[in-house]
Amino acid sequence: MVPYFEMAAASNFSFLCGASHPQELVERAHALDLSGIGIADRNTLAGVVRAHAQWKDIRKESGFRLFIGCRLSFIDGTPDMVVYPRDRAAYGQLCRLLTEGKHRAAIKGECHLEWADLLFRARQFQIAVFPPDEDEPDFAARLTEIAQAAPGSVWLALTMPHQGQDGRRAERIARFAAQAGVPLIATNDVLYHHPDRRPLQDVLTATRHHTTVFAAGRLLEKNAERHLKPPHEMVRLFRDYPEAIAATADFVAPITFQLDELKYAYPDEPIPPGKTAQQHLYDLVWEGAARHYGADMIPPKVQGLINKELALIARLEYEPYFLTVYDIVTHAREKGILCQGRGSAANSVVCFCLGITGVNPTQVDLLFERFISAERKEPPDIDVDFEHERREEVMQYVYDRYSRDRAAIVATVISYRSRSAIRDVGKALGLSEDVTAALANTVWGLSGGGIDRQHIRQAGLDPDNPIIQRAVELAITLIGFPRHLSQHVGGFVLTRDRLDETVPIGPAAMDKRSFIEWDKDDIDEVGLMKVDVLSLGMLTCIRKAFDLIHQHKPQLYGGEKLTLASLPRKDKAVYDMLCKGDSLGVFQVESRAQMNMLPRLRPQEFYDLVIEVAIVRPGPIQGDMVHPYLRRRSGQEPCTLPSPSPQHGPANELQQILGKTKGVPLFQEQAMRIAMEAAKFTPEEANQLRRAMATFRKMGTIHTMEKKMIDGMVNRGYDRTFAENCFNQIKGFGEYGFPESHAASFAHLVYISAWLKCHHPEVFAAALLNSQPMGFYAPAQIVRDAREHGVTVLPVDVNFSQWDNILEETPDVHLALRLGFRQIDGFSKRDTELLIADRQEPYRTIEDMHRRLRLDRRAFTLLADADAFGSLDIDRRAALWAVRRLPNDETLPLFRAAAASELAQEPRTKLPEMAASEHVIADYETTRLSLKGHPLQYLREGLAAEGVSTCRAVQEGADGRRMKVAGVVTVRQRPGSAKGVVFLTIEDETGIANIVIWPKIMKVFRREVMSARLIHIEGRIQRSLEGVVHLVAAKLQDRSAALIEMSGREAQRLIAPSQMAHHPRNVRVMPNSRDFH
């Protein structure tokens, strides 16, 4: 068979052009018996690692080859060409070429290249030039210029596109080749692996050009021929040009480069003179241990762990990595930025002694092999969280220290999910906006799954309509396709040499940031190390709370500012509060499921919080671990563990591993330990088990470990049924298994945030509000909870408020929470600064403010809408009328003062008072909360007439009782572990109620569940022994119209009819619920 290499294959990383995944192209090319394939996406190398990973499995059994290249498109008229680097040095030059083009482009994601960029590099590549579709007078000269720049390395691409004039077109291209003295090379210029993908490629093309498939015309491919074809078919097509087929082998002959050649070198860290990196790390670790435990009081266990870890770190030469993370964390702390390491790094006593993590190895039994293992060739991965509002300072420090040639953020591939796929396919097929929106709304959240026929019918559409069917089919295929690249949340790659010679780097949309073209899985595949500089809103909240305590209560805690390490521990009041499920706003335990679990688990010590964090996760739930643990914890079920045969090990072998979790494996580390102790896995095999657990839903590889583990346990004397049950529990972890070290790191913040809520509720509420957006709950729920805990909350006021929510002393309360201007939707920080700067004397009237401030009328209107003129003895309606009478913004200052003076002398018009209900709705519309009441209290009379109870009555209701309730939806949840069950949290003037919606009810009332702001529910009370109450829904009604009516009455009084459609109150009556999936 004649060898044929397809050297111009574009994957779907040629965004909105290629219609196949890189893996599909490689797999199909091998199945068709091609000799090899070249992946060449347009101005990017983003998809090559995925192709490489697929090819690695194939090459073991055949001589099939993969070539890493790129299709270059130029902005100066140079024809397109595919280029392939011959060796590692040439590959580095290709990366730098693309990096230069990306930084030159003004728009993120584009790459602007010119011929001059390639000219001095051309001799390092194999180049295939693509002729233009139409005659271009200067193409022959261009081709000759390219050929002269890289003698012997340039070919002219020849295709047979089945467009009716292939013969004549081929003759024209052959003449060009002869004139320039370059050979022809055959290619099918592939856009997809199989002809079935042609319709999807049409959709992608229409989306790229912002048109529809029906209006795209010649922008679309004329047929479905641009797919991978077998060698015999290519030989037939090019029978008149056999030399073009043979040329594919000549083209690839000099190419030796593969991604396996990329060798990572971690940057050298500065160390004190006379020391090695190993000595410097050794000194820092022991100094940290002395600080934590006392110089002569380091426990022997800790000493042994330190020596063990340092020896392994030295053996693997990872010292620079630890020194880098130590330096970043130290810099943050010097700047007063809270930070804490988490994840598998919390298994390391070295990380604890360096101050990177907060998990004390004497509190938690660590498994260092979960973090670093000599047997597996994986770099360590340390995740460090920083305050989310100050994380950027840390990131810029990293850029400054390592330079932008050697440091960049990892990419995130933004892929199509169900909703985005439906929207783009709908637009491309010309569906109306309302039909496309209806289809998209059949999908919950950001689902990556399919689209249910029943949901389509519920949306008022016909699932048997051919156009709807076509749209659904194409959308399902499109799900998972890359849409574009973005930056990772904070993962940095740092290198000793130029990073832009390993992977192209481009500018991020965010100023002063740059990111590489590969995501975290790609860099794992090629062996690049990553430092994660992540953000966590709760750290911001805690730091702001510490600042407020130090500012307003300096006499406490010895006058010292609190830190993450200095907070009082073992506080019974904190655990008593959590046992009641009183955890709104508390880190990691504020969800509905966690609030329900707290009274059942009843935490009494720190390790209970570690379990609390981990147990309400899909892994333990799907592994059927939750109920056995709770039964054993409460003494309802004995905790008995089998033993191996006496000759194989101690009787308490499993007790040592599972004793603290009542015989139930809750953590990945326990699963690894069971494999190592009970089945005698090596550390490397145990890590393979961990990886199989993490990926079995995608890869299905965990079954390969099943026989080995079960047989290993049986051979050591364990009962086979027990071994099988044990493995099934571990398998239930799936991709959701939670590391104990990670849970311990988070439990640290659970305790701290709970302590703040327990002892300083006004401080905690202010810090939470000042750290938004974060967490499960909106400002209205945070303020309601604070008031229930005895906090006095004061409204936004022009004479007292700051940008942030602050604490202020009042005659009858030591500290009250004053709402800040940040709570007013649309009011800017700049306007706040102007308002505060001129507030040495109180503002007396709106006209006085207008005279003194250079705020535009919009700012005054926002303040009036928010009822922020209370200290001026003027309410919302009067303030809005006063603002309307102010001079126009264009009035010159001299005349503005005169006009304001005149206005101030006019008597105020007596206006009818706003109804209390109108005030409440207006509060929600402007500040997202109200201190004057709740919308439901103004609907209560009508609801009571219907027999609708309050949320408080539901909480007090007897088990099994049927009740009706209505409330504003604040949270929607559909956890992946809940098997289709949906949970709602609703709120009225008396509190909250928790609603459970079973899948069969969800099918009937899907639209109401997904879209209602105010919802009416009939159902039956379900009360647990621990007092956790749910209302199990049977019927639901959307009553949102009642809220709109309450808002509309006031809007009609103040706004001309022609403006009604544009008024913000018609956009949102109540804040959106917070939905979690």
Swiss-Prot record:
> Could you give a single Gene Ontology term from the biological process aspect?
DNA repair
Molecular function terms, GO-annotated: 3'-5' exonuclease activity; DNA-directed DNA polymerase activity; nucleic acid binding
Record keywords: Nucleotidyltransferase included? yes
Question: Gene3D superfamilies under this entry?
Answer: 1.10.150.870, Metal-dependent hydrolases, Nucleic acid-binding proteins
Q: What is its EC number?
A: 2.7.7.7
Q: What is its main location?
A: cytoplasm
**Places the protein is found:** Cytoplasm
Q: Do the record's keywords include Repressor?
A: no
Question: Which Gene Ontology cellular component terms are annotated?
Answer: cytoplasm
The set of disulfide-linked cysteines is none
Which reactions is this enzyme annotated as catalysing? DNA(n) + a 2'-deoxyribonucleoside 5'-triphosphate = DNA(n+1) + diphosphate
Keywords associated with the record: Cytoplasm, DNA damage, DNA repair, DNA replication, DNA-directed DNA polymerase, Nucleotidyltransferase, Transferase
| Function recorded in the entry | DNA polymerase involved in damage-induced mutagenesis and translesion synthesis (TLS). It is not the major replicative DNA polymerase.
Instruction: State the HAMAP family in the record.
Output: DNApol_error_prone (MF_01902)
The entry sums up its family as follows:
Belongs to the DNA polymerase type-C family. DnaE2 subfamily.
Q: What is this protein called?
A: Error-prone DNA polymerase
Organism this protein belongs to: Brucella abortus biovar 1 (strain 9-941)
